[in-house]
Structures are given as structure tokens and as C-alpha cells.
């Protein structure tokens, strides 16, 4: 194996989401307003407690680590503690780690940062306990809480935090980053491969980068087929065909497409529901039909999340659409 091949292989084995994670706030893509506010905090060295809310892969963890890097320089890891609030060992273990970190000498810095991920996974009682912990150490610790849904964070915590709402990244921002990484890793990325990565990611940069790395393992060319296979994502036209067949009254054809997606392509029922919801306004249907499809999607999603059989519920949804219900 040549030296160049060895370097390329080593690069493929490294996790790209960490390798290409932005190091400073200026490097963060797609959130200019949020970055501007955060830079203002950092420039004054006057952080408040913060709540980062938004979907996965939109830059919440990246912004937290970038803040620490800019405040503490090369020693940032000594003054930054990252925890997962849904740690299976419970909030008591999390609180113990917070206390130990907060009580440790911190070499001249005014405060340290604790980044608490998945804070919305905590029960209301656990969040109340967390609020008391935040108050106890507010003099020398700043908390950055991360969640998918701010509505699941109790008001007493929200009122103590500056809230930043991260939206899914724009397709252009995701595409730009994917092109950059592909060039850096010497990956031949086709245009349809890029489009597929952007579609599969749906604003989630982490998913796009992971998809690129996984698809590149099978060869140096990443095209549409490789992306859809590795990300377990249905092609948009397959979703469109499945729904249109049902709306046209052809349940058999619609069910055949569903069966292929579930069985041959191994796509989860929940993911099919998500893609249906994303794609509904791309279908050539009137508003009344769109409303009917959305109602069926909502009912099916609810039943699946409650534990019902995915295939049965999806087939029932298609049958309902085929009957004009």
C-alpha cells in the first residue's frame, strides 16, 4: 500500500463529523443571527445560562464547544464539561458530576461551562432538581442546555436561560459543506449523489456528513444509488408513486411500492411517514386531497409511535386513501 493510499484510508477511518466540526463561531454555517448574539456574549466574557433548542445536526453542540474554545483557548477542555442529561444512571449521577466539576479549582477563569445535552429527556421532577443545581452553582458555572423541543423544558429553567432556537440548515449550506469535505477527502461526488445527500439529511448536517463518509467506503465515487442505500432513505419519486397510486384508487400498486420500501430497501415505517410528510406539497394534488393525506399521515404516525405494527398501519393508511376516505 502506497503512502498516499495509507493516508486516504486513515482519513476514512476518522469520524468526519468530528474532523470537520467548526472550531470557532465564525466557522459555524447557517445561523448568522445566533452566531452574532453568541459572539457578543463571548466578546464581553459575560455568558448567561443558555438553552439551545432545535433538531439534531443543526449546530447546537458545535456552538457550545466553539464558545468554550474562544473563551478558554487551548485549555478549553479543562473548563468545559459535556454531559448527557438522559444518562441512564439518572439525574443523581449527573448532579454529582456537576458538583465535582463546579467545586474543582479552575485556574483563574471567572466561570466554567457545563453543556447538558438532551435536557428535554428529563422528567419534570428531574428538571426541577436540575434547576436547583443551576442556582446552587450559578456564581462559578454557566449552563448550556440542549434540547430538541423547548416546550418540554419547564418554565423555571427557561426563564433562567437565554433561549436560542436552531432551525434546520438550508439545503445550500449543507451542499456547500458536503462539496468541501468531498474535495478534501478526494471523493468523487456526483451531482445526483449530492442532491440525494441533501435530501436525506433534511437540514441535518451531521446526517449528511455521516452519509457521505458511509457511502464513500464502498468506493471513491458517491452517487445517488450509494447514498439512498446507505442512508435507508426512499427516493422521492418512490414516495410520490406510492401515494399517487393510492389516490388514484390503485391500492395493489401502492401496496407493492410500500412492500418494496419496507422489505427490499429496509426503510423503517417511521422514516416513510417522515418522508411522506416532507413531500406532500410536491405532489400534484389539490388542497382537499392534501388535507386528507395529512390527516391520514398524522393518525398513522400517532399509532406507530404508540407501538402499533408499522406495516399494518401504513397499509391501512394507503387503503383509506385508495377508498377516498
Curated annotation (Swiss-Prot):
One of its GO terms (biological process) is DNA repair. The keyword ATP-binding applies. Part of the RFC clamp loader complex which loads the PCNA sliding clamp onto DNA. One of its GO terms (molecular function) is DNA binding. Keywords: ATP-binding, DNA replication, Nucleotide-binding. ATP binds at residues 54-61. This is Replication factor C small subunit. HAMAP family: RfcS (MF_01509). GO terms for cellular component: DNA replication factor C complex. Transmembrane segments: none annotated. Heteromultimer composed of small subunits (RfcS) and large subunits (RfcL). Belongs to the activator 1 small subunits family. RfcS subfamily. InterPro entries: AAA+_ATPase, ATPase_AAA_core, DNA_pol3_clamp-load_cplx_C, DNA_Rep/Repair_Clamp_Loader, P-loop_NTPase, Rep_factor-C_ssu_arc, Rep_factorC_C, RFC_lid. It comes from the Archaea.
